[in-house]
UniProtKB/Swiss-Prot annotation:
Catalytic activity line of the entry: ATP + H2O + cellular proteinSide 1 = ADP + phosphate + cellular proteinSide 2
The entry's keywords: ATP-binding, Cell membrane, Cytoplasm, Membrane, Nucleotide-binding, Protein transport, Translocase, Translocation, Transport
Name of the protein: Protein translocase subunit SecA 1
Main location: membrane
Functional note: Part of the Sec protein translocase complex. Interacts with the SecYEG preprotein conducting channel. Has a central role in coupling the hydrolysis of ATP to the transfer of proteins into and across the cell membrane, serving as an ATP-driven molecular motor driving the stepwise translocation of polypeptide chains across the membrane.
Protein family: Belongs to the SecA family.
Gene3D superfamilies per the UniProt record, alphabetical: Helical scaffold and wing domains of SecA, P-loop containing nucleotide triphosphate hydrolases, SecA, preprotein cross-linking domain
Family matches, as Pfam families: P-loop_SecA, SecA_DEAD, SecA_PP_bind, SecA_SW
Keyword Transport: yes
Topology within the bilayer: Peripheral membrane protein
Broad class of enzyme this protein falls into: translocase
GO biological process terms on file: intracellular protein transmembrane transport; protein import; protein targeting; protein transport by the Sec complex
Cellular component, GO, one term: plasma membrane
Length: 950
């Protein structure tokens, strides 16, 4: 119903966009007369007018006309009317639904240019690093021609390179990189370590893939945790000995395993324990479940491959190998044990955010995709994004044939090879979509037997993917691809002219970024030649029927199927598509497979005779709808629970930023001191009468906090006639607060004598940042475990979400109290030493070559102390700086966990990080042990009970 309501205003929006496009078109005549220099000068004119109060909406027609003309002069491509409509929809903060081949990448240039004029930055999000780099170079040529800076964020960049890219007018990158940089900035210890400059306007390419599919998996930065691989190895030995349906059951639909009583007894016998489920053995249950999942649900060459003794995840949707990424919660270690390769340690969470809440940080969102209408309700509900279907430039003439269903997979693949051989004979290009590396290699072997030349595009050979796709529309080209979602390169009949031209120029040593002038000159010379060659070949391909897309299996998402089909029939070209299915396909087995098999049995058809039945089509659609609905529920649930964490995250990150930006913390620390001592006094004076107070215990506790300078006797008997009853709670509190203030002033004088003026402010900054980070990390553990068990509250007729919100709030307030107490204790008791300041101007830190060196550089920068740029002068005045022992240790390498390109699995990528983790955090072998370790570490971080007198 909501989807229908959202579509009511589509017609009006399209008409409005058509008027904008017509107005831009009317300005083209005047813009075409401008010289290159005059066209470039328009950017400065727009910036000036915007600074004087003219809005971007008012500048839109002229800016679009200028950017359109620049695209024609630089790329030889003039955006069509429908692309102008799409560009306007993006600027207005909508999702532009543009079919494959309609030029979404070129469309994004116009709103990016317009919003780049504002000077607050534009982020363009793509699905992978290759496309981010390609688009920043390709479309960046237009922006650079017009005088705007263009940057790109890639996985292996150093912090300095990232900062330069973010300071550009327009920045390209992937959602994971943008999100991780946000988290790293909120783990930084100086402003110099921060790279982002705010969240103004974002354009998301393949918006449904990024904001819908990948939204199921949060971004997580984690640090190394101690752990033993013995249990993984032991359970990898037991899993093959256990029998399915006897010892355990498997639910393929929900991707879960359940251990039967016989299975529990078997494991207990093998391990020599009495009760698997008693408290001491409960961590073993997780090892058992992961071992069985690794055996039944994770298949080699489909879900992962093993290369050079390492388990590498294969993206289910796109078929790419996700280098360096890992499953979480011990799943990757279980697979490593199954495959008998080195088992690497688990990690502990340091920072996390969901994609939904990251993209909500932006003032304005927009997105592009070919398949968003089915998700319009979700995009509107979560991101407040409207979906606007943009008409195609030319009518679609592709023929979508009905599915062919075979009884066995073998019969299906024989039919596929026969069909492809027939198309190859007449010179028609064919694109075959498969769902796994294993299937693509099987088909490749069959084609080789039949002597059919072909290219394979899958997880093992993805380095060549752009080149293979660019030529997939040439005469007789046969391309086998694991999946086409997010590939990002157009399949043009006769060959992709832009790609082929670029390849020739790069082969001659030219580069659009390194040698822009020579590249542009050669481009205009080479482009007409390539166009002519490709045009002649395209004519032959059209006669043969255009591109034929053949799917070998239906995907669980209809959008992925539609994206595969959409590769054919772009820009009004002829084309054809068909799916070949069998009862052995994953989707068929998970839903309604038995009913279809009984139907085929009753029909008594031979294996090699397919059926085309509406009932089967309906069953497939029903299965896909069920999966999509399940995934939607998962995403909604993730968002509901993360909203609790999001509010807490905002408080912590805002506080960190305030500290980083150099605000004077002296008053805040004094307020903390007041709160902590007040809490101590309240706890000791809870009984109503002074004679009932245990002041000795209070003094013992206070001495762990600061060097107490008054004695209980002084307070109790101020003169010979006074009585203990004369001491009130307020008098006690005021006396202790006055004493603590004097002690803090003495501590400040001591440190300034040691390291010069401003030393105490520097220590306050360092201590607060480190304590906040430590307590936040511990809080993340606690919230994680609270969420794991909160579902059981439903058995007590309580709403788990409400309980999570209530208990999460209580835990957060307790954490803030802990931050105050630990900070005060550290400020009084931490051991410090003076470090000589450098005698010369501080040179820039050498840029590390890759993320593995990221942490070392970050830690070195963090040890500079201070509050960043605003306090640079203050740092220079101090003859030396302080180093606090125990809170400025070296940073460990970090691990990044986020969604793959489809969001189907939580994975991890190793690298360095910008924040420090206190050393000596014993993480434990199991999640329960890690939790206890976090608690112990939190307790152990409190100040020593004796204070060294000076």
């Amino acid at each position: 119903m909501l989807s229908k309501l959202l579509r009511v205003g589509e017609g009006r929006m399209v008409k409005r966009l058509k008027k904008v496009a017509d107005y831009v078109e009317s300005l083209s005549g005047d813009v075409e007369k401008l010289t290159d220099a005059e066209l470039r000068a328009k950017t400065d004119e727009f910036k000036k007018r915007h600074a004087e109060g003219e809005s971007l909406d008012e500048l839109l027609p002229e800016a679009f006309a200028v950017a359109r003309e620049a695209a024609w002069r630089v790329l030889g491509q003039r955006p069509f009317e429908v692309q102008l409509m799409g560009a306007a929809a993006l600027h207005l903060g909508n999702v532009a639904e543009m079919k494959t081949g309609e030029g979404k990448t070129l469309t994004s240039v116009l709103p990016a240019y317009l919003n780049g004029i504002g000077g607050k930055g534009v982020h363009i999000v793509t699905v992978n690093d290759y496309l981010a780099k390609r688009d920043s170079e390709w479309m960046g040529r237009v922006h650079r021609f017009l005088g705007l800076d263009v940057g790109v964020i890639l996985a292996q960049m150093t912090p300095e390179e990232r900062r330069v890219a973010y300071n550009a007018d327009i920045t390209y990158g992937t959602n994971n990189e943008f999100g991780f940089d946000y988290l790293r900035d909120n783990m930084a210890h100086t402003l110099d370590d921060c790279v982002q400059r705010g969240h103004n306007f974002v354009i998301v390419d393949e918006v449904d893939s990024i904001l819908i599919d990948e939204a199921r998996t949060p971004l997580i930065i984690s640090g190394p945790a101690d752990g033993s691989s013995n249990w993984y190895t032991e359970f990898a030995r037991l899993a093959p000995l256990m029998e399915k349906d006897t010892h355990y059951e498997v639910d393929l639909r929900k991707r879960t395993v359940g251990v039967h009583e016989l299975g529990v007894e078997f494991v207990e016998d093998q391990l020599g324990i009495d009760n698997l489920y008693e408290a001491a053995n409960s961590p073993l249950v997780s090892y058992l479940n992961n071992a069985l999942k690794a055996k039944e649900l994770f298949n080699r060459d489909k879900d992962y491959i093993v290369r050079n003794g390492e388990v590498l995840i294969v993206d289910e949707f796109t078929g790419r190998v996700l280098i360096g990424r890992r499953y979480s919660e011990g799943m990757h270690q279980a697979i490593e044990a199954k495959e008998h390769v080195e088992i690497k340690a688990e990690n502990q969470t340091l920072a996390t955010i969901t994609l939904q809440n990251y993209f909500r940080l932006y003032n304005k969102h927009a997105g592009m995709t070919g398949t968003a209408q089915t998700e319009a309700a979700e995009l509107h509900e979560i991101y407040k994004l409207g979906v606007v279907p943009i008409p195609t430039n030319r009518p679609m003439v592709r023929e979508d044939q009905s599915d062919l269903i075979y009884k066995t997979e073998e019969a299906k693949y024989i039919a596929v090879v026969d069909d492809v051989a027939e198309r190859y004979e007449k010179g028609q290009p064919v694109l075959i979509g498969t769902t796994s590396v294993e299937r693509s290699e099987y088909l490749s072997r069959q084609f080789t037997k039949r002597r059919i030349p072909h290219n394979v595009l899958n997880a093992k050979y993805h380095e060549q993917e752009a080149g293979i796709i660019a030529e997939a529309g040439r005469r007789g080209a046969i391309t086998v691809a694991t999946n086409m979602a997010g590939r990002g390169t157009d399949i043009v009949l006769g060959g992709n002219v832009d790609f082929l031209t670029d390849k020739r120029l790069r082969d001659n040593g030219l580069d659009p970024v390194e040698t822009p002038d020579e590249y542009e000159q050669a481009w205009h010379q080479e482009l007409p030649k390539v166009k002519e060659e490709a045009g002649d070949e395209a004519t032959e391909v059209i006669k043969a029927g255009g591109l034929y897309v053949l799917g070998t299996e239906r995907h669980e998402s209809r959008r992925i199927d539609n994206q595969l089909r959409g590769r054919s029939g772009r820009q009004g070209d002829p084309g054809e598509s068909r799916f070949y299915l069998s009862l052995g396909d994953e989707l068929m087995r998970r839903f309604n497979g038995a009913a279809l098999e009984s139907l085929l049995t009753r029909l008594n058809l031979p294996d090699d005779v397919p059926i085309e039945a509406k009932m089967v089509t309906r069953a497939i659609k029903s299965a896909q709808t069920q999966v999509e609905q399940q995934n939607f529920e998962v995403r909604k649930n993730v968002l509901k629970y993360d909203e609790v964490m999001n509010q807490q995250r905002k408080v912590i990150y805002a506080e960190r930023r305030r500290i980083l930006e150099g605000e004077n913390l002296q008053q805040q620390v004094k307020d903390m001191l007041t709160d902590v001592i007040t809490a101590y006094v309240d706890g000791a004076t809870v009984e109503g009468y002074a004679e009932d107070w245990d002041l000795d215990a209070l003094w013992t506790a206070l001495k762990t906090l600061y060097p107490v300078g008054i004695k209980t006797d002084t307070l109790m008997r101020r003169d010979q006639d006074s009585d203990r009853d004369d001491l009130t709670r307020d008098e006690l509190l005021q006396a202790l607060l006055q004493d603590a203030d004097q002690a803090y002033a003495a501590r400040e004088a001591e440190l300034e004598e040691l390291a010069g003026e401003g030393a105490m402010r520097q220590l306050e900054r360092n201590v607060l940042l480190n304590v906040i980070d430590r307590k936040w990390r511990e809080h993340l553990y606690e919230m994680d475990y609270l969420k794991e068990g909160i579902g059981l509250r439903a058995m007590a007729q309580r709403d788990p979400l409400v309980e999570y919100q209530r208990e999460g709030y209580d835990m957060f307030m307790a954490m803030l109290d802990g931050v105050k107490e630990e900070s005060v204790g550290f400020l009084f008791n931490v051991s410090v030493e003076a470090v000589p300041a450098p005698q010369v101007e501080v040179a820039p830190v050498a840029e590390p070559e890759d993320l593995a060196e990221f942490a070392t550089a970050a830690a070195a920068a963090a040890q500079e102390g201070g509050a960043g740029r605003k306090n640079a002068a203050a740092r220079e005045e101090a003859p030396s700086r302080l180093r606090a022992k125990g809170i400025e240790d070296e940073s460990p390498a970090l691990t990044y966990s986020g969604p793959s390109e489809d969001g189907s699995a939580q994975v991890q990528r190793n690298g360095g990080g910008a924040a420090k983790t206190p050393a000596g955090v014993p993480a434990g072998r199991s999640r329960r042990e890690r939790r206890e370790a976090a608690r112990r570490q939190g307790r152990g971080a409190k100040p020593p009970k004796s204070v060294k007198k000076r």
